[in-house]
Amino acid sequence: MRHGRGSAVSAAISGLSPAKNSPFPQLCNVLLVASLSKTLSQSGTRSLDANSIPISEPVVLQILRRNSIDPSKKLDFFRWCYSLRPGYKHSATAYSQIFRTVCRTGLLGEVPDLLGSMKEDGVNLDQTMAKILLDSLIRSGKFESALGVLDYMEELGDCLNPSVYDSVLIALVKKHELRLALSILFKLLEASDNHSDDDTGRVIIVSYLPGTVAVNELLVGLRRADMRSEFKRVFEKLKGMKRFKFDTWSYNICIHGFGCWGDLDAALSLFKEMKERSSVYGSSFGPDICTYNSLIHVLCLFGKAKDALIVWDELKVSGHEPDNSTYRILIQGCCKSYRMDDAMRIYGEMQYNGFVPDTIVYNCLLDGTLKARKVTEACQLFEKMVQEGVRASCWTYNILIDGLFRNGRAEAGFTLFCDLKKKGQFVDAITFSIVGLQLCREGKLEGAVKLVEEMETRGFSVDLVTISSLLIGFHKQGRWDWKEKLMKHIREGNLVPNVLRWNAGVEASLKRPQSKDKDYTPMFPSKGSFLDIMSMVGSEDDGASAEEVSPMEDDPWSSSPYMDQLAHQRNQPKPLFGLARGQRVEAKPDSFDVDMMNTFLSIYLSKGDLSLACKLFEIFNGMGVTDLTSYTYNSMMSSFVKKGYFQTARGVLDQMFENFCAADIATYNVIIQGLGKMGRADLASAVLDRLTKQGGYLDIVMYNTLINALGKATRLDEATQLFDHMKSNGINPDVVSYNTMIEVNSKAGKLKEAYKYLKAMLDAGCLPNHVTDTILDYLGKEMEKARFKKASFVRNKPNNNNISS
């Protein structure tokens, strides 16, 4: 110490024993703490003399509590005190204080060594300190050290408070360490089944059961991470334990999880179990509004919008008032299943009941309205959204721009995009991707490449969707050399080099001689004829079995009789297709190969090169790639149908179902198109009827496909009824719909009907295209023929009368 002052103080104090000889023990401690604090702050522990400093627990605690001393020097002092053993050992209070310092200052790497010293000193870690340590370690991501603390407590034979384990589980879930949380949970559940004997021979059950809050957090985490098998394992394990009881929130989580994963039977059985529990334990254990929201969401996912609407009507008179989430879920479900009239009705009721629609609700309504070809109504809805002060998002404008492009309003879409760019608002990478795709559709590749360059300049990353659209455009126009241009314009990231390497590798594989091991073996073996398609979409017996209700006692006091009836049904039919249509590019981290395969399938099939597409498909099958999307199978099946290879198309469909790839609306469009080409409009109608009865829906492409099939089969009355049905369901006919009705009526000789549809088309503001011109030429010739025929009949009639006279 400087100038010898410290040594003098130490010498003075060393001659005293604060506990016995000194009449001023507190003053001695104060002087000693001040001296030690100054020494530690200036030179650390190297100037301390163990023989001259009387260390006691009060002194150590005051040093550790001093805010003026650096935490690392406190830690050094704490370790320096080890050298005083066996004369001095740290107490539990001292360890608690140093642990608090370590946790507060982030020196958590010292925890394992401190625990080892604690064990040597024979000091036990208390419950409170263990919880603080665990929380700090988990927050800092030091999961191994946290497990070390748990092991340390178990070695001591100390049974931790269940709340400690609950906090650990919750913290791990929030840190997305679900595997670690699962291992701890199952370890706790195994320990809860263990039995031990006390001195009197009684059996003691070790209570390590986690709380419902921690379990609920874990189940939510597993659901969000799409860990289906782990979710089911936790659910079944807890259901099998008599001492663990699910609460209402647990049931709601499980209903939502099983429903979203396609297990409607499990979701309905859980609802039934909740109702039974409420009859025994009271209404507090029964379904609440969140339960009904989850069930309505599940029914909408299964395409059972009709059932969801009935449950909603029951809900309104059952004492459970619909909330904002209820309306949002129903509007989303109706918009996705093209029930726009129902969606707008619910939207109106939502406003009438005092709920304010948010951006998500308006986005769903805008998307559904534009897909239903109601451009004017969509624009009016957007204006209302702005007037009511609901903030539009990038997604809102993306829906508008994409909808304008798809409804033949490309100029309006480009104008809106340019206005947003000038303002510097509501434009993201998806907006650029949508506009770039439209430019590629129109063949304006130079503009698309410039747009990509601008996209990078503005700091947006160019995604695989945009690049694949450009590649398809290059191949369609034969611009093979333009692929290298992407390297100049897209400079950031490794995406473009990976795409070009993938392209070069596939082209080299396609040039290799094909293996002859599978010669004369069908690539897509079929299990039947394409005309046997009804067996694949389910039989009427399946639908009937779902309608059979198991015997149940009618509860006149039930608030949800229809929901009770659904819950008592067995073997609910699986949905025939998913509401979401398969995308060519999903742009997921693990789907690069499949995305690129779908892109090049589109390229080869658009050029009519079916053999090259089949070879590419075979290469990937040989590589063991099985996670193909519905887009892959739909593309292959559509090409075979167009070429008239119906048996092979059936084989593609069989392989699709064997690989558990869910069909979508595009799959059934191809099926109906194939049946129409085979002249079996009756089967096409039957497939569509079965589809709608089992929860399916029709989009405008499906309507157009079936109208065309019925018209070519001269079933004009049914085609007309379907056309009217489309309009009554809130879907405006497009140019393809009108062209089809004009053509089939013209060819059937119903010229007045054809002219009526032409006038309706123009009155609706639907712009004709080049196909319309061709059909109108044919209609004009037929009308001219009819005019000549009528005129010749009028001329011949007087002549015949003169001859007879």
Swiss-Prot record:
This is Pentatricopeptide repeat-containing protein At4g01570. PPR repeats lie at residues 91-125, 126-160, 161-196, 211-241, 247-277, 288-322, 323-357, 358-392, 393-427, 428-462, 463-497, 593-627, 629-663, 664-698, 699-733, 734-768. Belongs to the PPR family. P subfamily. InterPro entries: Pentatricopeptide_rpt (IPR002885), TPR-like_helical_dom_sf (IPR011990). PROSITE patterns: PPR. Keywords: Repeat. The lineage of its organism: Eukaryota, Viridiplantae, Streptophyta, Embryophyta, Tracheophyta. The keyword Repeat applies.
